[in-house]
């Protein structure tokens, strides 16, 4: 039987300035299986980014356990676990350290002591995978937001983590940049057994995941497939979230007497279905 690659049990967290009876995270429990894409959604201040920082040891929980690939997260294991996790943050400008795109992608490999010949091969392959090979000698500051996040993802590809955590990685991007990043992640998953955990308030992004956790007031309120979660439209709105564009479009079509198959959860899926519907007329 396959074991979870992430296993969180009864996790509590409070910030130092909080009173002892106040918790930012309360009794959080969930698992993530190898190769799964799980989206953790919630409004700003719900606790989802605090959870992400607990998962890779940037913050230490007040109670509960986090197990990653069979290792319980602790002061003794944190560096081993961090080697298994790649993290892409909200602001791409905060994660660049190299003078050029290629230098930045190579940074984590230098820290790992990867031989130079292998490093060059992995950097080139990673940039090709995110379609940024023509920008290898560019300064990161001169890239667009979507390009910067694709370079950050290239750094993760080159480092070959088992788990990729995206902490609001698309929230500062325009729609085109957001789509570039999500397409890159789908391609990464198609080419490897990568496990993805995306922390987001963008309910449309969650439609790409295999499973969705909804966090509100520091607690897991809902868990299920995107289709199951999107059925709880009113509950999501009460928690400060919106319904995905595809679901709003479905509702509008149903009001016009057009029945839409339930499996179309994304804008692209709906566009393809509408085009097929039009072509059949």
Curated annotation (Swiss-Prot):
It is a peripheral membrane protein. Its main location: membrane. InterPro entries: AAA+_ATPase, ABC_transporter-like_ATP-bd, ABC_transporter-like_CS, ABC_transpr_CbiO/EcfA_su, ECF_ABC_transporter_ATP-bd, EcfA_1, P-loop_NTPase. GO terms for molecular function: ATP binding; ATP hydrolysis activity; ATPase-coupled transmembrane transporter activity. Residues 6-242 form the ABC transporter domain. Gene3D superfamilies: P-loop containing nucleotide triphosphate hydrolases (3.40.50.300). It comes from the Bacteria. It is found in: Cell membrane. ATP-binding (A) component of a common energy-coupling factor (ECF) ABC-transporter complex. Unlike classic ABC transporters this ECF transporter provides the energy necessary to transport a number of different substrates. This is Energy-coupling factor transporter ATP-binding protein EcfA1. It comes from Lactiplantibacillus plantarum (strain ATCC BAA-793 / NCIMB 8826 / WCFS1). The gene is ecfA1.
């Amino acid at each position: 039987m396959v074991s979870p690659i992430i296993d969180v049990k009864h996790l509590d967290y409070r910030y130092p300035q909080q009173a002892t009876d106040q918790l930012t995270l309360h009794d959080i429990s969930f698992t993530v299986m190898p190769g799964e894409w799980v989206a953790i959604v919630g409004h700003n201040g719900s606790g989802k980014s605090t959870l992400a920082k607990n998962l890779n040891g940037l913050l230490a929980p007040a109670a509960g356990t986090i197990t990653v690939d069979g290792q319980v997260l602790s002061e003794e294991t944190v560096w081993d676990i961090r080697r298994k996790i790649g993290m892409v943050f909200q602001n791409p400008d905060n994660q660049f350290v190299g003078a050029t795109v290629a230098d930045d992608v190579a940074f984590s490999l230098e820290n790992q002591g990867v031989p130079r010949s292998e490093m060059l091969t992995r950097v080139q392959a990673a940039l090709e995978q995110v379609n940024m090979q023509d920008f290898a000698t560019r300064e990161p500051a001169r890239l667009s937001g979507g390009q910067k996040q694709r370079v950050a993802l290239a750094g993760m590809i080159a480092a070959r983590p088992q788990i990729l955590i995206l902490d609001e990685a698309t929230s500062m991007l325009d729609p085109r940049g957001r789509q570039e990043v999500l397409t890159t992640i789908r391609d990464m998953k198609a080419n490897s057994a990568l496990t993805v955990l995306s922390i987001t308030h963008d309910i449309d992004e969650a439609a790409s995941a295999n499973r969705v956790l909804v966090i509100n007031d520091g607690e897991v309120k809902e868990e299920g497939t995107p289709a199951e979660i999107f059925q709880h439209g009113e509950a999501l709105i009460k928690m400060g979230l919106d319904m995905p564009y595809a679901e709003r479009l479905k509702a509008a079509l149903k009001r016009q007497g057009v029945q839409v198959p339930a499996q179309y959860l994304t804008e692209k899926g709906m566009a393809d279905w509408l085009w097929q519907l039009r072509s059949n007329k």
